[in-house]
UniProtKB/Swiss-Prot annotation:
GO molecular-function terms, A-Z: UDP-arabinose 4-epimerase activity; UDP-glucose 4-epimerase activity
Keyword Ligase (UniProt): no
Organism from which the protein derives: Oryza sativa subsp. japonica (Rice)
GO biological process, any: galactose metabolic process
Protein name in the entry: Probable UDP-arabinose 4-epimerase 2
């Protein structure tokens, strides 16, 4: 018995020694690997590298902004709770930019202040592009408290975290809905803000918070008030894919494509009694590629202690009926159109004067052909009938 035990003990010791040796070797190999560091590259500032936090980066506009930032060699962290965004869009971006230190995704809700502060404490951000928001006018009239919480309160949470962790640049995604229904057109940045729906009111409150804070801060602030967004990535990599339950609140382009694909029986145009030439609303439709370009130019031009406020639009108003005809032409589909009563909270006419952003940021909308923008978006929709689920 003693003899047997004495033979087993060295064997056990030997195995233990080998295991320790292998563990040490693995640690050495990992430490020598270029992808292994004791702290993430996202947690430290690097000379020549600008790290941008993109809130809502899994959404339609945020994902397109992330694509442009990555293409321009920015480091990007996306924070999104995926309530309106798509993980599929994030995966597309991850496949396009797989290199370490380029892109990270963090699942979090901006309504959770502890989570937001943890994110800021663990990452070295140089700037924030704040897109995350619920953004449907009709829905805002049905769920106003949700909009004030999601837009106004969450913006305050982000701003407080930026102040606490010394993040000095904010590019804020605002909206022409803050103007309401002005007496004169086109809308300039000096046009009085009198929003008429909870979406516009919540955005204006968020703007006011940012502006009040900026008065006693060296933060560089850019507020972009943009108009009706259409189009998609010309390279066909990203598109708009709202959740099925949100389609009734979505953009007119999405409804038009759904009708062309046969997902819905036809297109519903709400309101034909507006005081416009053909009775339908007039809007300024801005291509998402141009919109993203405005954000990047704003980031580049942002100055410490300064606030820039800009309208982002084409400067041309198009009626809903004009839009529908352009959509029919782009899709080649025979789309049934039903005319219904007005949607609560909508306004008759709104289009921009983009002179200020042209003069100060050297930005001009380039994708101004309505049919071409819709054709680009239609190609993505046809290739992805189930959104990113068919990617």
């Amino acid at each position: 018995m003693d003899f047997g035990d004495s033979r087993r003990k060295p064997n056990v010791v030997g195995k233990f020694t080998v295991a320790v040796a292998l563990t040490v070797m693995c640690i050495i190999v990992l430490k020598q690997s270029p992808g292994f560091t004791s702290t993430s590259v996202f947690s430290r500032h690097e000379i020549g590298v600008t790290h941008v936090l993109v809130t809502g980066g899994a959404g339609y506009i945020g994902s397109h902004a992330t694509l442009r930032l990555l293409r321009d060699n920015y480091r990007v962290t996306i924070v999104d709770n995926l309530s309106r965004g798509n993980m599929g869009a994030v995966r597309v971006l991850q496949r396009l930019f797989p290199e370490p230190g380029r892109l990270q995704f963090i699942y979090a809700d901006l309504g959770d202040a502890k989570a937001v502060n943890k994110i800021f404490s663990e990452n070295a951000f140089d700037a924030v592009m704040h897109f995350a928001a619920v953004a449907y006018v009709g829905e805002s009239t049905l769920e106003p408290l949700r909009y004030y919480h999601n837009i106004t309160s969450n913006t305050l949470t982000v701003l407080e975290a930026m102040a606490a962790y010394n993040v000095k640049t904010l590019i804020y995604s605002s909206t022409c809905a803050t103007y309401g229904e002005p007496d004169t057109m086109p809308i300039t940045e000096a046009t009085p803000q009198n929003p008429i729906n909870p979406y516009g009111k919540a955005k204006k409150m968020a703007e006011d918070i940012i502006l009040d804070f900026s008065k006693r801060s060296e933060m560089a602030v850019m507020i972009l008030r943009y108009f009706n967004v259409i189009g998609s990535d010309p390279g066909g990599r990203l598109g708009e894919a709202p959740r099925p339950e949100l389609r009734e609140h979505g953009r007119i382009s999405g409804a038009c494509f759904d009708a062309a694909l046969g997902i819905i029986p036809g297109l519903k145009v709400r309101g034909t009694d507006y005081p416009t030439a053909d009775g339908t609303c007039i809007r300024d439709y801005i291509d998402v590629t141009d919109l993203v370009d405005a954000h990047v130019k704003a980031l580049d031009k942002a100055q410490p202690g300064k606030v820039g406020i800009y309208n982002v639009g084409t400067g041309h108003g198009r009626s809903v009926k004009e839009f529908v005809e352009a959509c029919k032409s782009a899709t080649g589909a025979s789309i049934k159109v039903s005319f219904l009563t007005r949607r609560p909270g909508d306004y008759a006419e709104v289009y921009s004067d983009p002179s200020k952003i042209h003069d100060e940021l050297n930005w001009t909308a380039r994708y101004i052909d309505l049919r071409e923008s819709l054709s680009t978006a239609w190609k993505w929709q046809k290739a992805h009938p189930n959104g990113y689920g068919s990617a």
